[in-house]
Amino acid sequence: MSNRTLLNLKFVLCISTLMSSLAFAANAANDNVLNVYNWDDYEAPDTVSNFEKQTNIRVVTDHFYTIEALETKLLAGKSGYDLVFPGSDFVSHQINTGIFLKLDKSKIPNYKNLDPVKMKFLSKLDPDNQYAIPYQQGTTGIGYNVKKIKEIFGNDYVVDSWDFIFKEENISRLEQCGVAVLDSPVEVFATTLNYLGLNPNSSESVDYERAAKLLTKIRPYIRYFRTSQYSDLASGDVCVAFGWSSEVLMGIERAQKANKGLEINYVVPKEGAVLWYDMMAIPADAKHVDNAYKYMNYILEPAVMADISNYNLYSNAVLPALDLADKSVASNPNITIPDDKLKLMFVVEPQDEKLNEVINSLWEKIKSSKK
C-alpha cells in the first residue's frame, strides 16, 4: 500500500469516525428513549409497556439490588440515566451535592394528584419538594410468625407495641425462634429514641448513648442484623423481624406461594414508626429530561399508581389512586397508614457528620456485643 493510499485511507477513516461520533451524540441527545435505574420488579407488569405504547418512547431499564449500587453510580457522575429511584433519606443527604436536577413542576401536570399532607411530611427532607417525587411508601415495623408467637405468648397475645422487642422479658422468650433486626443504624436508633419518648431525630449524642444502652441490653437475644430478612421469615428460620414493610410483605408473599401453612403478619406499632419513601428523581446530567418528566407524569396517573401499589403491596402519595387500589392495600392500616396514625410516624432526617460518626460507632459496638 502506497503512502498516499494509506493517507487517503486514514483520512476516510477519520471522517467516518467523526461522522459516527456526531451521529451518536445527536442520538444521545434526541433519541426517543428513557434510561431508567430502578429496583428490580418494582412496577406492575404492564407499567412500562403501556407508557411505551402511549408515548412511543423506548424505556431502557437497569436494575439495582442494593442502595449502595445506586449511590455509587450517582455520586460518581455521568451515570447515563435519565430517571432514578433513590430513597428519601438519600435524596435529603445529597441535595446539596448537585447530583439531582431541580424539578420543573409545570412539566408534571399530575403533580396535583399528590397528597399535600404527605408532601409536607416529605418537605422535611426535600425543602419545598424541589428535587424528587414520591413513588412508593413503606414503613419500618415488625413482622412475625403468627403460629410461633401464639405458641410462646398464648392465643390472646396481641403484637401492637414496640414493647414486643424492646422489653427484655419479651425478646428473651423470642430468642428460641429467632429475632432479626434491620442493619440500618439511623432507622433503628430513630425507632429506639421514639420508643424512649425522645426526639427520633435528636441531635444530642447523649440521647443516642441512652438508646444504645437499651439496644445493648436486648442484643443477646438478637440472632442477626441484616437488611434483607424476608427469606428467613418466610422459611421459618426466624419468627420475628424488625425491618422494612417491603421485606416482610415479600416474606408473606413467599410464604403463601410455598403453601406450607406459614402465616406471617406485619404491624406498625402503636407508638409510631419510621415512614420512608422511594422517590423519583432526575440526575443533573440526564440527557433525556423531557422524557423523564413524561414518565413521572405518567406514574402519577391514579390508575397507573394504583396498579403499581396493587402489585407491590405498597401505599403511595397519589390521593385518587387509593380509591382505585385493592382493599388489601387501601384498607390495610399497616400499608396505607390512616391519618390518625400518620401523626405518629416520622422520617429519618439527615444529621451532621460528627453525629453520624457517633451513631455508627455505637452501632458497631452494639452488633459486636452478642453476649
PLM region descriptions:
Residues 10-23:
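Bacterial N-terminal signal peptides
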Residues 339-371:
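Conserved C-terminal helix/tail region of periplasmic/extracytoplasmic solute-binding proteins
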Residues 278, 283-344:
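Mature extracytoplasmic/periplasmic domains
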Residues 26-97:
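Early extracytoplasmic/lumenal segment of secretory-pathway proteins
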Residues 81-86, 223, 239-244:
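Paired acidic/hydrophobic, glycine-rich loop segments that form the ligand-binding mouth/hinge
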Residues 91, 95-223, 230, 234:
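Extracytoplasmic ligand-binding site segments that recognize negatively charged/polar headgroups
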Residues 90-93, 240-261:
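A ligand-binding cleft/hinge motif common to bilobed small-molecule-binding domains
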Residues 208-216, 260-281:
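Periplasmic-binding protein-like
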